[in-house]
Amino acid sequence: MLSFLISCGASPPVTEDLTSSVESTTDPINELFSQAVLLSGNEAFVLKIEAIEKLIENGSLERAQYEIERISVADSFEHKAVLKYLLFNAHIAKVNGQNEAAIQWLDDPLATEIDAASELGRDFLLAKGRTYITLNQPESAILTLAEVTEYWSMDTEITLYEDLWGALQNVNDQQLSVIAEDSTSYELRGWIELARAFNSEETSIKKQLDAIDQWRRTWVRHSAVARLPQPLKDLQSVWQTRPTDIALILPVLQPAGNAIYEGFLSAYYQELLVSQEVPKVSIYDSSNVLSIMELYNQAASGGADLIIGPLKKSFVNELLEKGELPVDTLALNYADSPRSNNNLFQFGLAPQDEIIEVANLAWENGHRTASILMPESGDYQELQEFFEQTWTQKGGRIASKVNFQEGANYADIVKNLVAIDGSELRSEKLLSLLPRRNMEFVPRRRNDIDFIFLVADPDAGRQIKPTLAFYFAENIPVYSIPSIYEGTYNPPDNKDLDGITFVDSPWMLRPGDVQNRPAEDNLRQASGPLQRLRAMGVDSFRLHPRLQQFSSGNITSLRGATGKISINENQVFHRQLEAARFVDGIATLIEK
């Protein structure tokens, strides 16, 4: 009946001349409005709503808006007509780009006793759920859409199940648990358990397929048993068409390449425990290669249906400049150009992702003015500029920025950062002008710094953080990127890092997590940077069968060892990391 509203405003606003619209409207619509003039109360209201429905069906949105704004509603009016009144107002608001106004109409106190078994009730709840999705409120969308699924016709083309599944994939485990605790509905509980089963096996498509089969045997009366969301339906095809011959191009004689190789192999053997149907892997060493194309073509002509690598940025630039590649390729670094090739995917440990995470975290915590403290070199200068750009685009301000060299005098650097040196200069000038020499000087730091963005290794951090405290800056929050953490349990040494908030990968912050084990159990101890490269190797293996899923949009993210991985329109993968803070020398997770 109201199928024209299902999208709830996917079209752009309609501009029309109101006078000509009134004159050209079909006689039945004008007749309804004429009849309504002769009536009052509920009877007039019902006729006007019927006329407005026809206006919207005809695409006459401007007149529909004009007419509906002149209507008064009361809770004593016919419930069905009242729901249409709210739904039509929400539709018009969404068409006009007013999503907040739309949800206010759909959440109106008059919107009570919505019968999901009725066509109007289903349309109303679907519009409401989709509006929540538009407003990035997945929890509310889940609660709303789950009311509808058991009543939804099997032959409808509407993507209700996909909408609900997308919302389920946009909440974390903790949010799912909260929803589950409040749920008394078999339908909603079933959806939650399906999401949990699917998410718990993200490391393996085969294990996900087994988990879905087990869920279907358990939740036999659930609507999704007969109608799985499309991404889950497609999973069997993804498994059957996965790459079976992988060429791995890495500088295995170099520490970075070897660490990635170790991580890749650990994930490979972890998958072997699940299924014997693992891909064939051939290694191509790029340690002494000056140009990648000869080695790349050798790997491609060797029968590979997927190439993972190369690692060197200049090699990735070569591949991008080549244009269309003969084989799907997952490069392990990022090209300088934002351009893309159809079958070139780019994945790595970009520090820009880490900086974005720190900036988001600081902003969410209410900070607006930053000071920057990082090493002095060309590479770090680029990162400093990226942080400044990211922070100022948010509306933040940079109070000061200081660069340091390894082994520098951190006292002078910190005094410069918080303007203690300026306070000392003013004191010296004042003392030189006054005759008395028994004046007591108390240095003061600048008081407009909300937080300090620090880029440093653990050794430098252990000197800088206490120095900040010595110069009256102990209460200024300090945020950092993964370089501040070496990844080992060392409370005595790390005590000097206490209070620093930083972001890092799950591999580093959740070493006992089921997603990482047994992958890391068989690996020797290594430094923090090499551990993160191992995690990258793990994720390169776990990503390899899912590239087309990402490319088609069937999945939008994957919880990996390096973070929550997503992809952009240029087939470049980005990571969302986790936050932690040093407490008593221990890197302690900050749960969101």
Which stretches of residues belong to each language-model region?
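Extracellular/periplasmic periplasmic-binding protein-like sensory domains
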Residues: 424-427, 447-449, 465-538
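Periplasmic-binding protein-like
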Residues: 300-312, 330-332, 369-375, 424-458, ...
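Bacterial Sec signal peptide processing site at the extreme N-terminus
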Residues: 8-26
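An alpha-beta-alpha
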Residues: 347-406
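Segments of small-molecule ligand-sensing domains
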Residues: 521-589
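Alpha-helical protein-protein interaction scaffolds
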Residues: 25-232
